[in-house]
Amino acid sequence: MRALYFRTTTLSTFFILCSLASNDIPRTGGNKIVQPPKPNILKQGCPSDLLHSRALRSIQLACRSHPATVISAFEGIQEGLQNCANRLRFQQWDCSEAGNIMHDPPLLRQGFRESSLIWALSSASAAWGVATACAQGWIDDCACNNHMGQNEYEFGGCTHGVQHGITASRKLLTKVGAVNSLLRKVEKHNLKAGRLAIKKTLISSCKCHGVSGSCQQKTCWKRTATLEHITDYLVEKYARAKLYTDDSVVKTTDLIYLEASPDVCKVKSVAGRVCAWRNETHTQGDCDRLCCGNGFSIRHEVVRVKCDCEFVWCCNLVCKDCIQHRWISTCNGTPPKSLIF
Protein backbone atom coordinates (compact mmCIF):
# COMPACT_ATOMS: atom_id res chain seq x y z
CA MET A 1 0.00 0.00 0.00
CA ARG A 2 2.94 2.30 0.68
CA ALA A 3 4.14 2.01 -2.92
CA LEU A 4 0.63 2.68 -4.20
CA TYR A 5 0.48 5.90 -2.20
CA PHE A 6 3.79 7.06 -3.68
CA ARG A 7 2.51 6.39 -7.17
CA THR A 8 -0.65 8.33 -6.44
CA THR A 9 1.18 11.29 -4.97
CA THR A 10 3.47 11.55 -7.99
CA LEU A 11 0.76 11.81 -10.62
CA SER A 12 -1.57 13.86 -8.45
CA THR A 13 1.15 16.47 -7.94
CA PHE A 14 1.60 16.67 -11.69
CA PHE A 15 -2.19 17.08 -12.07
CA ILE A 16 -2.14 20.04 -9.69
CA LEU A 17 0.82 21.78 -11.31
CA CYS A 18 -0.27 21.47 -14.92
CA SER A 19 -4.03 20.94 -15.23
CA LEU A 20 -5.10 24.57 -15.04
CA ALA A 21 -2.25 25.71 -17.23
CA SER A 22 -3.19 23.39 -20.08
CA ASN A 23 -6.92 23.98 -19.76
CA ASP A 24 -6.68 27.76 -19.81
CA ILE A 25 -4.22 28.74 -22.50
CA PRO A 26 -2.50 26.26 -24.81
CA ARG A 27 1.28 26.53 -24.84
CA THR A 28 2.44 26.90 -28.40
CA GLY A 29 5.58 26.48 -30.38
CA GLY A 30 5.02 27.90 -33.85
CA ASN A 31 1.63 26.55 -34.87
CA LYS A 32 1.87 23.44 -32.71
CA ILE A 33 0.50 22.95 -29.22
CA VAL A 34 3.23 21.89 -26.81
CA GLN A 35 1.95 19.29 -24.35
CA PRO A 36 3.69 18.22 -21.12
CA PRO A 37 5.29 14.77 -21.23
CA LYS A 38 3.14 11.79 -20.30
CA PRO A 39 3.92 10.48 -16.78
CA ASN A 40 5.59 7.09 -16.71
CA ILE A 41 2.77 5.41 -14.81
CA LEU A 42 0.44 6.09 -17.74
CA LYS A 43 2.85 4.23 -20.01
CA GLN A 44 3.21 1.16 -17.82
CA GLY A 45 -0.35 -0.15 -17.93
CA CYS A 46 -2.65 -0.97 -15.04
CA PRO A 47 -1.13 -2.35 -11.83
CA SER A 48 -2.25 -5.84 -10.80
CA ASP A 49 -4.74 -4.61 -8.20
CA LEU A 50 -6.76 -2.92 -10.96
CA LEU A 51 -6.05 -5.41 -13.73
CA HIS A 52 -7.55 -8.19 -11.60
CA SER A 53 -10.13 -6.08 -9.78
CA ARG A 54 -13.14 -8.06 -8.59
CA ALA A 55 -15.10 -4.97 -7.69
CA LEU A 56 -15.98 -3.90 -11.22
CA ARG A 57 -15.75 -6.03 -14.35
CA SER A 58 -15.55 -2.83 -16.40
CA ILE A 59 -12.22 -1.98 -14.74
CA GLN A 60 -10.67 -5.28 -15.83
CA LEU A 61 -11.82 -4.83 -19.42
CA ALA A 62 -10.78 -1.18 -19.65
CA CYS A 63 -7.35 -2.00 -18.20
CA ARG A 64 -6.70 -4.14 -21.25
CA SER A 65 -8.00 -1.71 -23.85
CA HIS A 66 -7.61 1.77 -22.28
CA PRO A 67 -5.17 1.52 -19.36
CA ALA A 68 -4.30 5.24 -19.35
CA THR A 69 -7.97 6.09 -18.86
CA VAL A 70 -8.33 3.71 -15.90
CA ILE A 71 -5.15 4.97 -14.22
CA SER A 72 -6.16 8.61 -14.71
CA ALA A 73 -9.56 7.86 -13.18
CA PHE A 74 -8.00 5.97 -10.27
CA GLU A 75 -5.52 8.75 -9.54
CA GLY A 76 -8.31 11.31 -9.73
CA ILE A 77 -10.28 9.33 -7.14
CA GLN A 78 -7.26 9.11 -4.85
CA GLU A 79 -6.76 12.86 -5.14
CA GLY A 80 -10.44 13.44 -4.40
CA LEU A 81 -10.28 11.29 -1.26
CA GLN A 82 -7.24 13.24 -0.04
CA ASN A 83 -9.10 16.51 -0.63
CA CYS A 84 -12.09 15.12 1.24
CA ALA A 85 -9.93 14.10 4.21
CA ASN A 86 -8.51 17.61 4.33
CA ARG A 87 -11.92 19.24 3.96
CA LEU A 88 -13.43 17.13 6.78
CA ARG A 89 -10.36 17.05 9.01
CA PHE A 90 -12.30 18.68 11.86
CA GLN A 91 -15.21 16.23 11.65
CA GLN A 92 -15.47 12.90 13.47
CA TRP A 93 -15.75 11.08 10.13
CA ASP A 94 -13.18 12.47 7.73
CA CYS A 95 -12.97 10.26 4.59
CA SER A 96 -9.46 9.15 5.53
CA GLU A 97 -10.22 5.42 5.66
CA ALA A 98 -13.09 5.27 3.17
CA GLY A 99 -11.16 3.34 0.52
CA ASN A 100 -11.09 3.62 -3.27
CA ILE A 101 -14.30 2.59 -5.04
CA MET A 102 -12.25 0.49 -7.47
CA HIS A 103 -11.24 -1.74 -4.53
CA ASP A 104 -14.84 -2.30 -3.35
CA PRO A 105 -14.42 -0.87 0.18
CA PRO A 106 -16.79 -2.05 2.96
CA LEU A 107 -18.33 1.42 3.32
CA LEU A 108 -19.86 1.15 -0.16
CA ARG A 109 -21.70 -2.04 0.78
CA GLN A 110 -23.80 0.07 3.13
CA GLY A 111 -26.32 2.82 2.50
CA PHE A 112 -25.01 5.42 4.94
CA ARG A 113 -24.82 9.17 4.39
CA GLU A 114 -21.03 8.78 4.22
CA SER A 115 -21.43 6.19 1.46
CA SER A 116 -23.36 8.71 -0.63
CA LEU A 117 -20.46 11.16 -0.49
CA ILE A 118 -17.86 8.55 -1.45
CA TRP A 119 -19.96 7.37 -4.41
CA ALA A 120 -20.49 10.90 -5.69
CA LEU A 121 -16.95 12.09 -4.99
CA SER A 122 -15.45 8.99 -6.65
CA SER A 123 -17.59 9.50 -9.74
CA ALA A 124 -16.72 13.19 -10.00
CA SER A 125 -13.02 12.65 -9.27
CA ALA A 126 -12.73 9.90 -11.88
CA ALA A 127 -14.27 12.22 -14.48
CA TRP A 128 -11.97 15.04 -13.39
CA GLY A 129 -8.88 12.82 -13.58
CA VAL A 130 -9.68 11.65 -17.11
CA ALA A 131 -10.66 15.14 -18.30
CA THR A 132 -7.41 16.55 -16.92
CA ALA A 133 -5.37 13.84 -18.63
CA CYS A 134 -7.25 14.56 -21.87
CA ALA A 135 -6.39 18.25 -21.63
CA GLN A 136 -2.72 17.32 -21.13
CA GLY A 137 -2.77 15.14 -24.23
CA TRP A 138 -2.01 12.00 -22.20
CA ILE A 139 -4.95 9.95 -23.50
CA ASP A 140 -4.99 9.34 -27.25
CA ASP A 141 -8.78 8.91 -27.47
CA CYS A 142 -9.47 12.46 -26.35
CA ALA A 143 -6.26 14.45 -26.71
CA CYS A 144 -6.63 18.00 -27.99
CA ASN A 145 -5.69 18.56 -31.62
CA ASN A 146 -1.93 18.90 -32.04
CA HIS A 147 -2.26 21.72 -34.59
CA MET A 148 -4.28 24.89 -34.22
CA GLY A 149 -4.76 25.79 -37.84
CA GLN A 150 -3.60 28.93 -39.61
CA ASN A 151 -5.26 31.32 -37.19
CA GLU A 152 -4.91 30.90 -33.45
CA TYR A 153 -8.47 32.01 -32.86
CA GLU A 154 -9.67 28.78 -34.43
CA PHE A 155 -8.53 26.89 -31.34
CA GLY A 156 -11.48 26.32 -29.04
CA GLY A 157 -9.88 24.74 -26.02
CA CYS A 158 -10.39 21.15 -24.91
CA THR A 159 -14.07 21.09 -24.00
CA HIS A 160 -14.61 17.63 -25.47
CA GLY A 161 -12.22 16.21 -22.87
CA VAL A 162 -14.70 17.12 -20.13
CA GLN A 163 -17.45 15.03 -21.70
CA HIS A 164 -14.98 12.22 -22.33
CA GLY A 165 -14.14 12.22 -18.62
CA ILE A 166 -17.80 12.12 -17.62
CA THR A 167 -18.49 9.27 -20.04
CA ALA A 168 -15.44 7.33 -18.84
CA SER A 169 -16.53 7.73 -15.22
CA ARG A 170 -20.00 6.38 -16.02
CA LYS A 171 -18.67 3.38 -17.94
CA LEU A 172 -15.99 2.51 -15.39
CA LEU A 173 -17.95 2.87 -12.15
CA THR A 174 -21.57 2.00 -12.99
CA LYS A 175 -22.31 -1.67 -12.43
CA VAL A 176 -24.05 -3.42 -15.31
CA GLY A 177 -27.31 -5.30 -14.98
CA ALA A 178 -30.74 -4.49 -13.65
CA VAL A 179 -31.05 -2.25 -10.61
CA ASN A 180 -32.99 -4.67 -8.42
CA SER A 181 -32.30 -3.36 -4.92
CA LEU A 182 -32.64 -0.07 -3.11
CA LEU A 183 -28.91 -0.01 -2.39
CA ARG A 184 -28.05 -0.36 -6.09
CA LYS A 185 -30.59 2.33 -6.93
CA VAL A 186 -29.07 4.71 -4.38
CA GLU A 187 -25.57 3.89 -5.60
CA LYS A 188 -26.49 4.63 -9.21
CA HIS A 189 -28.19 7.89 -8.23
CA ASN A 190 -25.17 9.15 -6.25
CA LEU A 191 -22.73 8.20 -9.00
CA LYS A 192 -24.79 10.28 -11.40
CA ALA A 193 -24.92 13.16 -8.91
CA GLY A 194 -21.13 13.10 -8.87
CA ARG A 195 -20.93 13.33 -12.66
CA LEU A 196 -23.42 16.18 -12.63
CA ALA A 197 -21.19 17.97 -10.11
CA ILE A 198 -18.57 18.22 -12.84
CA LYS A 199 -21.06 19.98 -15.12
CA LYS A 200 -22.41 22.21 -12.36
CA THR A 201 -18.94 23.49 -11.50
CA LEU A 202 -17.57 24.00 -15.02
CA ILE A 203 -15.65 27.23 -15.55
CA SER A 204 -15.70 29.31 -18.72
CA SER A 205 -12.31 30.24 -20.15
CA CYS A 206 -11.90 32.78 -22.92
CA LYS A 207 -9.06 34.03 -25.09
CA CYS A 208 -9.10 37.34 -26.93
CA HIS A 209 -7.76 37.77 -30.47
CA GLY A 210 -6.95 40.96 -32.28
CA VAL A 211 -4.29 43.57 -32.87
CA SER A 212 -2.19 44.30 -29.75
CA GLY A 213 -4.39 42.06 -27.63
CA SER A 214 -7.65 43.83 -28.47
CA CYS A 215 -10.70 41.62 -28.17
CA GLN A 216 -11.99 41.87 -31.75
CA GLN A 217 -12.70 38.17 -31.58
CA LYS A 218 -12.98 35.89 -28.61
CA THR A 219 -12.81 32.12 -28.28
CA CYS A 220 -14.43 30.56 -25.21
CA TRP A 221 -14.62 27.02 -23.88
CA LYS A 222 -15.53 25.14 -20.72
CA ARG A 223 -13.02 23.51 -18.40
CA THR A 224 -13.29 21.61 -15.17
CA ALA A 225 -13.02 23.43 -11.87
CA THR A 226 -10.25 22.48 -9.47
CA LEU A 227 -10.85 19.22 -7.66
CA GLU A 228 -10.78 21.13 -4.37
CA HIS A 229 -13.75 23.20 -5.55
CA ILE A 230 -15.62 20.11 -6.76
CA THR A 231 -14.95 18.41 -3.41
CA ASP A 232 -16.30 21.44 -1.53
CA TYR A 233 -19.43 21.39 -3.72
CA LEU A 234 -20.09 17.72 -2.92
CA VAL A 235 -19.32 18.09 0.78
CA GLU A 236 -22.05 20.75 0.91
CA LYS A 237 -24.39 18.29 -0.81
CA TYR A 238 -23.35 15.64 1.72
CA ALA A 239 -24.32 17.95 4.58
CA ARG A 240 -27.82 18.19 3.06
CA ALA A 241 -28.12 14.55 1.94
CA LYS A 242 -31.64 13.13 2.05
CA LEU A 243 -32.94 9.86 3.47
CA TYR A 244 -34.37 7.86 0.56
CA THR A 245 -37.50 5.72 0.51
CA ASP A 246 -39.52 4.18 -2.32
CA ASP A 247 -41.80 7.21 -2.53
CA SER A 248 -39.09 9.86 -2.11
CA VAL A 249 -38.90 12.73 -4.58
CA VAL A 250 -35.32 13.91 -4.96
CA LYS A 251 -33.36 15.98 -7.44
CA THR A 252 -30.72 14.33 -9.60
CA THR A 253 -28.08 16.55 -7.97
CA ASP A 254 -29.04 15.54 -4.42
CA LEU A 255 -27.08 12.96 -2.46
CA ILE A 256 -29.29 10.27 -0.92
CA TYR A 257 -28.81 7.53 1.67
CA LEU A 258 -30.80 4.59 3.07
CA GLU A 259 -30.00 4.32 6.77
CA ALA A 260 -28.70 6.29 9.70
CA SER A 261 -24.95 6.17 10.20
CA PRO A 262 -23.49 4.36 13.22
CA ASP A 263 -21.85 6.33 16.02
CA VAL A 264 -18.32 6.97 14.77
CA CYS A 265 -16.96 6.73 18.31
CA LYS A 266 -18.32 3.19 18.63
CA VAL A 267 -17.11 1.77 15.32
CA LYS A 268 -13.91 3.64 14.45
CA SER A 269 -10.63 3.98 16.32
CA VAL A 270 -9.42 7.54 16.79
CA ALA A 271 -5.96 6.55 18.01
CA GLY A 272 -3.28 8.81 16.54
CA ARG A 273 -5.68 11.32 15.05
CA VAL A 274 -4.40 14.91 15.17
CA CYS A 275 -6.62 17.35 17.05
CA ALA A 276 -6.41 20.96 18.26
CA TRP A 277 -5.73 20.81 22.02
CA ARG A 278 -5.48 24.61 22.35
CA ASN A 279 -8.89 25.19 20.81
CA GLU A 280 -10.90 26.77 23.63
CA THR A 281 -14.01 27.40 21.52
CA HIS A 282 -14.83 23.67 21.36
CA THR A 283 -15.67 23.83 17.68
CA GLN A 284 -13.41 22.76 14.82
CA GLY A 285 -10.70 20.28 15.74
CA ASP A 286 -11.52 20.17 19.44
CA CYS A 287 -9.68 17.22 21.03
CA ASP A 288 -12.48 16.28 23.45
CA ARG A 289 -14.92 15.83 20.58
CA LEU A 290 -12.62 14.29 17.97
CA CYS A 291 -11.05 11.87 20.47
CA CYS A 292 -14.45 10.61 21.63
CA GLY A 293 -13.52 11.19 25.27
CA ASN A 294 -10.43 8.92 25.13
CA GLY A 295 -8.01 11.73 25.95
CA PHE A 296 -5.00 12.90 23.97
CA SER A 297 -1.22 13.19 24.10
CA ILE A 298 1.00 16.16 23.22
CA ARG A 299 4.49 15.96 21.74
CA HIS A 300 7.03 18.41 20.32
CA GLU A 301 8.37 17.95 16.80
CA VAL A 302 11.01 19.66 14.70
CA VAL A 303 10.13 19.17 11.06
CA ARG A 304 11.62 20.19 7.75
CA VAL A 305 9.06 21.88 5.50
CA LYS A 306 9.02 23.45 2.06
CA CYS A 307 8.81 27.25 2.03
CA ASP A 308 9.17 30.26 -0.27
CA CYS A 309 7.93 28.19 -3.19
CA GLU A 310 7.96 29.54 -6.73
CA PHE A 311 6.15 28.13 -9.74
CA VAL A 312 8.53 27.77 -12.70
CA TRP A 313 6.84 27.36 -16.09
CA CYS A 314 6.02 24.56 -16.79
CA CYS A 315 5.53 22.53 -14.55
CA ASN A 316 8.02 22.76 -11.70
CA LEU A 317 7.54 23.97 -8.15
CA VAL A 318 10.86 25.13 -6.66
CA CYS A 319 10.99 25.51 -2.87
CA LYS A 320 13.46 26.17 -0.06
CA ASP A 321 13.83 23.89 2.98
CA CYS A 322 12.86 25.44 6.31
CA ILE A 323 12.81 24.20 9.91
CA GLN A 324 9.56 24.43 11.85
CA HIS A 325 8.77 23.68 15.51
CA ARG A 326 5.40 22.08 16.18
CA TRP A 327 3.41 20.93 19.17
CA ILE A 328 1.29 18.03 17.99
CA SER A 329 -1.70 16.68 19.90
CA THR A 330 -2.99 13.22 18.96
CA CYS A 331 -5.89 11.18 20.26
CA ASN A 332 -5.45 8.20 22.53
CA GLY A 333 -7.60 5.24 21.66
CA THR A 334 -8.13 1.56 21.15
CA PRO A 335 -7.52 -0.61 18.06
CA PRO A 336 -10.07 -0.34 15.20
CA LYS A 337 -13.50 -1.69 16.13
CA SER A 338 -14.98 -1.91 12.65
CA LEU A 339 -13.85 -2.16 9.04
CA ILE A 340 -16.81 -0.14 7.74
CA PHE A 341 -15.53 3.39 8.33
Swiss-Prot record:
Pfam entry (one): wnt
Subcellular compartments: Secreted, Extracellular space, Extracellular matrix
Glycosylated position list: N279
GO biological process: asymmetric cell division; canonical Wnt signaling pathway; cell fate commitment; cell fate specification involved in pattern specification; establishment or maintenance of cell polarity; interneuron migration; motor neuron migration; nematode male tail tip morphogenesis
Disulfide links within the chain: C84-C95, C134-C142, C144-C158, C206-C220, C208-C215, C265-C292, C275-C287, C291-C331, C307-C322, C309-C319, C314-C315
Modification(s) after translation: Palmitoleoylation is required for efficient binding to frizzled receptors. Depalmitoleoylation leads to Wnt signaling pathway inhibition.
Superkingdom, natural source: Eukaryota
Listed GO MF terms: cytokine activity; frizzled binding
Cellular-component GO terms for this entry: extracellular space
Name of the molecule in the record: Abnormal cell lineage protein 44
Gene responsible for this protein: lin-44
